């Protein structure tokens, strides 16, 4: 006689499966992205953000971002299994099948789109869908393997969140929101190129034409330094157009100076582990920069 399956015996399996699905959504990346969405929402209005677009917008955008991340896991499952940084992901390890990953990504993305379309506005729903396609299909499935400028071109999809937050509240485009997009668009190459330097051998092993693989590490270091200077200029644009005040100006200047210095060190004073230090600094740079935007908005404006 077969032994009945107990509820308690199935709990560990459920826990492992749930964690695997959650991991596929790249929660840390989505969390940073949602911060930029929130800032876009807050800067779009002079006072408090209306509750419905705030909650529904954050939920819908988070779901579609998680869907894009899951599709990234699905498309990259072969190369992920060959790289030390990613070999332990759910798909290469067989914790989730490709079919289930596709169903999960499609379901999550569809639900997110429905939430945005019905509870926020169609403009935000379609813009978020375009970002999903841009990241999951245009970048991951094509650009990543096609050109060393993959990060530069594909970075536009990842730079959209502040605009999505803005349109979720206002249902319209605004030049100020585009300035925030420009900041993230300019921030993306030095952020990813620093990681690519650290993981150059792994990218070369799986034939991904990241800039350090195709043009060499020294050329990439120069590009990182130049982009941090461009980023510093981009970060000043909100001040120049009167969008932000002195609180943001001071914070932005300090953060830009720090990023340029780290990039200069990488170029002229490199040592083991410095590329990853630059990569981590870039994350804090973006997070603190957008927190400064928020602080300035409520303290100065």
From Swiss-Prot:
It is an enzyme of class 2 (transferase). Carbon 2 of the heme B porphyrin ring is defined according to the Fischer nomenclature. This is Protoheme IX farnesyltransferase. GO terms for biological process: heme O biosynthetic process. One of its GO terms (cellular component) is plasma membrane. It comes from the Bacteria. It catalyses: heme b + (2E,6E)-farnesyl diphosphate + H2O = Fe(II)-heme o + diphosphate. Belongs to the UbiA prenyltransferase family. Protoheme IX farnesyltransferase subfamily. Pathway: Porphyrin-containing compound metabolism; heme O biosynthesis; heme O from protoheme: step 1/1. One of its GO terms (molecular function) is protoheme IX farnesyltransferase activity. InterPro entries: Protohaem_IX_farnesylTrfase (IPR006369), UbiA_prenyltransferase (IPR000537), UbiA_prenylTrfase_CS (IPR030470), UbiA_sf (IPR044878). Its main location: membrane. Converts heme B (protoheme IX) to heme O by substitution of the vinyl group on carbon 2 of heme B porphyrin ring with a hydroxyethyl farnesyl side group. The chain crosses the membrane at residues 29-49, 51-71, 101-121, 123-143, 150-170, 177-197, 223-243, 244-264, 274-294.
């Amino acid at each position: 006689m077969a032994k009945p399956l107990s509820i308690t015996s199935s709990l560990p399996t459920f826990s492992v499966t749930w964690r695997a699905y959650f991991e596929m959504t790249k929660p840390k990346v989505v969390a940073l992205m949602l911060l930029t969405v929130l800032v876009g929402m807050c800067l779009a209005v002079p006072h408090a953000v209306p509750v419905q677009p705030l909650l529904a917008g954050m939920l819908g955008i988070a779901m579609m971002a998680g869907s894009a991340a899951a599709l990234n896991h699905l498309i990259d499952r072969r190369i992920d299994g060959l790289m030390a940084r990613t070999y332990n992901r759910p798909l290469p390890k067989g914790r989730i099948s490709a079919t289930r990953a596709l169903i999960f990504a499609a379901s999550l993305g569809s639900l997110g789109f429905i939430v945005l379309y019905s509870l926020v506005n169609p403009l935000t729903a379609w813009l978020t869908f375009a970002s999903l396609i841009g990241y999951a299909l245009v970048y991951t499935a094509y650009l990543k393997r096609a050109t060393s400028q993959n990060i530069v071109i594909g970075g536009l999809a990842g730079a959209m969140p502040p605009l999505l937050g803005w349109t979720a509240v206002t249902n319209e485009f605004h030049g100020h929101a585009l300035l925030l997009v420009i900041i993230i668009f300019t921030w993306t190459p030095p952020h990813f190129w620093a990681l690519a330097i650290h993981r150059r051998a792994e990218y070369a092993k799986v034939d991904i034409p990241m800039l350090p693989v195709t043009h060499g590490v020294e050329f990439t270091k120069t590009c990182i330094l130049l982009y941090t200077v461009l980023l510093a200029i981009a970060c000043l644009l909100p001040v120049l157009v009167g969008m932000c005040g002195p609180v943001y100006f001071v914070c932005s200047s300090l953060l830009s100076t720090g990023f340029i210095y780290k990039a200069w060190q990488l170029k002229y004073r490199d040592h083991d582990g410095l590329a990853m230090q630059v990569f981590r600094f870039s994350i804090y740079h973006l997070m603190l920069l957008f927190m400064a935007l928020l602080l300035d908005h409520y303290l100065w404006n």
